[in-house]
Amino acid sequence: MKQKDSFYTFCLKFLLIFFVMVLIYEQFFPEKKILIQQDRLVYLPDQKKSVPLELEWVLLSEIPEEWIFYTVQVEDKRFYSHKGYSISDIHSSLISSVLFFRKIRGASTITQQLARTLFLSREKSFSRKWKEIQIASALEDELGKNTILEYYINSVYWGRGMNGLNQASRYYFKKKPTNLKFNQFKALIQILKKPDAYTREEVILLSKNL
């Protein structure tokens, strides 16, 4: 029993240290920057982290507000209130990883997903999660919510080798994004959690049931 109590105490201390590190980073590392330079998105603390911007771009202004609202509700309900990461989600992820000896879970905010898509691998580890939080925080500071949403919709992985709404809508529905029906757009958002789990036919069927 004592052994179990000491293990839980260790886990709680570990989580406390992690959150303190996040807060310290937020307060004392103002040099973190994400900038658009010419046609590239650059993460300044590491100049090697430079991402070309795609040409098949869909402006946020071209997407109906109802569709944007749906995206946020499905992918990240607290998107407009957090600073790029969710402490509660990080907490539950770390608890699961430490107590049950699992790899750290991939659940992330929209901003963290964008950080991972643009600058990081899909490896599930504490170090990658820490970098993800740093970059997400920088994205929030430099780009703002609407720009983050626009970048997210244009870069997120939609399965079958498709990145971004333009490629996804053309692959799954053979349409430009602006010609999609709302139920088709909803189907595309629904598959984002496990994009490679769906075939084109399954996505079309899903759209008919929404």
Question: Predicted segment positions?
Answer:
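Juxtamembrane regions of bacterial inner-membrane/periplasmic proteins
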Residues: M1-L210
